[in-house]
């Protein structure tokens, strides 16, 4: 069922889908590989535009979201997710490779 530009699916059909939005290829591939070897479905996206296109196809049960991204940062992606009725309840885990005191 299509509602507000997003496909709505039963809870059973999205139970294991995890989206990974990470622009660093090696990190994205590692995370997706690890999740898949845990018998979970995972799909990686390099850019927010690809991620939004994926969201129109399938709503995931979890999103792993990088903070620093091309096109728009992860915090603005999170804000958009929380503003939309169909995605505001999707759990999001923020990822970052930043480790300096300034970044904390």
Listing of model-derived features with the role each one plays in the protein:
Residues 44-62:
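Acidic, metal-coordinating helix/loop segments flanking the phosphotransfer/catalytic sites
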Residues 24, 45-49, 104:
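Conserved Asp/Asn-Gly motif in the active-site loop of CheY-like receiver
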Residues 66, 96:
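Active-site residues of response regulator receiver
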Residues 24-43:
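Two-component/phosphorelay signaling modules centered on CheY-like receiver
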Residues 59-61, 86-91:
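His-Asp phosphorelay/catalytic-motif detector in bacterial-type signaling
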Residues 70, 100:
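The feature encodes the CheY-like receiver
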Residues 84, 98-99:
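Short, conserved "switch-loop" micro-motifs in signal-transduction and mechanochemical regulators
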